[in-house]
């Protein structure tokens, strides 16, 4: 990789490299931004903010402001150097116009301007321009304001000077195209989570997020995300709902073979492993070579230390320690910067660069060895926890072996309570996890027997967030779910905690619970189980929530099921002149109040039902919320519920 002095690198039109035109983006938008739903819509903001982050990483930008305007347009402004506006040597037009209208044009493709840069697909801001009905670019440079406007990626007029200024930087405003996106309404929380994540990943950068759309009381929201200590604060944030095993964050920030590596890790008393990895600020959900390097170093160093200091303890417990024992109760964040990342995997979020494994392995190995030598007391606490984890793993294997059935599709050994479907084609089949035996009975009568299977859940299932790993396999309800789905553990190595989903029997797993507090609790318990034990099912899009109706509204011959308070209010306005007493209103407290026919037409019929797909937009934030809502500590949970009470449905 070429080296250069960041302050000496001049950033002008000659640094902008041009690769291809924009028509392709409007024809096949999903290829460039992932999809055209809510996810892709928010991706436009990330692409634009990534430009500002690149300026910050190069040392030129300290402040980024992101604003959601009342008309759902977005403004991103930074105090970097400003996109160059001089004439491009090859293109014969302003560099700003080239950056804004040519795909893959930008400083990030010229090695001198940026050593590394973010952007999932690296498509740059021109892609945002192509997918917006209108975009306004302003550059504050050399005391002048340069401006150009575009429509669907095409310039409306040449770059012109529209005023003078003391500011420095770039301001982008865009209006997403409703003909391309299925929704153009931005969600504050989704943007806030990503901006918080970016602030932690890039210590010292201030990101201000403002939502100018007033709420019901007429208030606007604004938050500033800033982290002085970066990953050290990030790992504490994720772990704030858990009890710490040791107080220290083990931290390193170094460079190996020209690759900047930053890692923060800490141990807690929980039983789950939570490692979040990033490449150029992108969350590599599927891991990759940098994660493999981290795990190798962790196992190598801790195993050596445990064998040197606790050999008698290990022999007495009659166990052999394996890699996963070192990761139980570990929360870690790995952030690497790679000049030319190769992304693989289904969602293009797995790092393939082989050099990252060796670099991370070396960096983590050195830092961890030093920490253990300098902190014998904390090191002993870690080793004790590792031995406990290994002992529990052996117990888990025994518990699992006693219940694991031989062949998931063989028909033998399925749970007695499961009413299975007749089809054997997993992609057509659905499994309903139904709260309570009575609702389970109605669901069994209502279902389409060819493709819909029913598994009733009795009472509240085990809260796995508070339980040792092997306890799940001792719980009948959890075992029934695992067995019914055809999931196996310990296939890829005798004691692996990795769930094997190759023989998954249903491609849709639907949680069906009452629309009250108990129902929501059961949904959360089941989601926690999936998130901690088989997250790949969520990532592959197999987990759903059923949406039973809350009301049945009748007026004369009009009979309608309403799935929200808003729908009910609309019905009352339309058919009851706003008077609730003039219509017949039935409130469904539970699934059991509906007969099988009603349950089928409202909640189970694929033609008419509503389903919510469970997705993990932001793994670190999901980890934090699950640990806080389902963990031991009551304080943070109360604070969270109070802060989010406005968004939650509280059933008195």
Language-model region placement:
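Helical (often loop-to-helix) elements that flank the catalytic cores of nucleotide-handling enzymes
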Residues: 89, 344-357, 561-567, 571-572
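C-terminal interaction appendages of subunits in large macromolecular complexes
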Residues: 391-410, 425-430, 441, 445-447, ...
């Amino acid at each position: 990789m070429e080296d250069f002095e960041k302050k000496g690198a001049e950033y002008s039109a000659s640094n902008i490299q041009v690769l291809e035109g924009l028509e392709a983006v409007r024809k096949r938008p999903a290829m460039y931004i992932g999809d055209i739903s809510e996810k892709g819509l928010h991706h436009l903001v990330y692409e634009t903010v990534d430009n500002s982050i690149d300026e910050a990483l190069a040392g030129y930008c300290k402040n980024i402001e992101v604003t959601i305007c009342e008309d759902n347009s977005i403004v991103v402004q930074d105090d970097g150097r400003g996109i160059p506006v001089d004439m491009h040597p090859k293109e014969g037009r302003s560099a700003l116009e080239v950056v804004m209208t040519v795909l893959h044009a930008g400083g990030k493709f010229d090695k001198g301007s940026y050593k590394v840069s973010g952007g999932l697909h690296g498509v740059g801001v021109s892609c945002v321009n192509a997918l917006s009905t209108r975009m306004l670019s302003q550059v504050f440079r050399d005391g002048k304001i340069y401006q150009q406007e575009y429509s669907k990626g095409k310039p409306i007029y040449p770059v012109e000077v529209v005023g003078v200024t003391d500011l420095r930087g770039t301001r982008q405003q865009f209006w997403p195209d409703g003909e391309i996106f299925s929704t153009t309404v931005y969600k504050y929380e989704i943007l806030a989570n990503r901006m918080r994540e970016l602030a932690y990943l890039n210590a010292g950068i201030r990101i201000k997020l403002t939502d100018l759309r007033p709420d019901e009381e007429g208030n606007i929201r604004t938050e500033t995300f800033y982290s002085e200590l970066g990953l050290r604060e990030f790992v504490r944030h994720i772990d704030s709902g858990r009890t710490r095993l040791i107080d220290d964050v083990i931290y390193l920030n170094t460079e190996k073979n020209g690759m900047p590596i930053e890692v923060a890790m800490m141990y807690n008393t929980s039983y789950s492993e939570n490692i979040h990895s990033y490449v150029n600020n992108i969350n590599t959900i599927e891991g990759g070579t940098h994660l493999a390097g981290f795990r190798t170093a962790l196992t190598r160093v801790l195993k050596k230390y445990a064998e040197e200091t606790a050999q008698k303890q290990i022999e007495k417990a009659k166990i052999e320690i394996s890699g996963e024992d070192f990761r139980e109760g570990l929360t870690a964040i790995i952030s690497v910067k790679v000049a030319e990342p190769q992304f693989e995997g289904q969602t293009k979020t797995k790092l393939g660069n082989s050099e990252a494994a060796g670099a991370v392995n070396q960096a983590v190995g050195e830092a961890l060895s030093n920490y253990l030598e300098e902190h014998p007391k904390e090191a002993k606490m870690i080793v004790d926890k590792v031995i406990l984890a290994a002992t529990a793993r052996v117990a888990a294997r025994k518990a699992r072996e006693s219940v694991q059935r031989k062949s998931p599709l063989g028909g033998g050994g399925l749970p007695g309570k499961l009413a299975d479907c007749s089809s054997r084609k997993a992609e057509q089949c659905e499994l309903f996890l139904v709260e309570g035996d009575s609702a389970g009975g109605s669901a069994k009568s209502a279902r389409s027997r060819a493709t819909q299977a029913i598994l009733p859940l009795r009472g509240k299932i085990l809260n796995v967030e508070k339980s040792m790993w092997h306890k799940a396999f001792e719980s009948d309800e959890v075992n029934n779910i695992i067995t019914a789905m055809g999931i196996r553990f310990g296939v890829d190595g005798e004691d692996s905690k990795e769930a094997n989903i190759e023989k998954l029997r249903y491609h849709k797993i639907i949680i069906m619970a009452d629309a009250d507090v108990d129902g929501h609790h059961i949904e959360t318990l089941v989601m926690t189980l999936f998130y901690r034990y088989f997250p790949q099912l969520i990532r592959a899009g197999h987990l759903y929530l059923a949406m039973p109706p809350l009301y049945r509204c009748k007026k004369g011959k009009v009979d309608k099921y309403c799935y929200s308070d808003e729908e009910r209010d609309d019905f009352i306005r339309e058919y009851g002149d706003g008077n609730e007493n003039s219509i017949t209103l039935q409130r469904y407290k539970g699934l059991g109040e509906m007969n099988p026919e009603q349950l089928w037409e409202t909640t189970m019929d694929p033609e008419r039902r509503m389903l919510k797909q469970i997705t993990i937009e932001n793994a670190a934030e999901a980890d934090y919320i699950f640990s806080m809502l389902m963990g031991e500590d009551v304080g943070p949970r109360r604070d969270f519920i109070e802060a989010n009470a406005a968004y939650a449905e509280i059933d008195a």
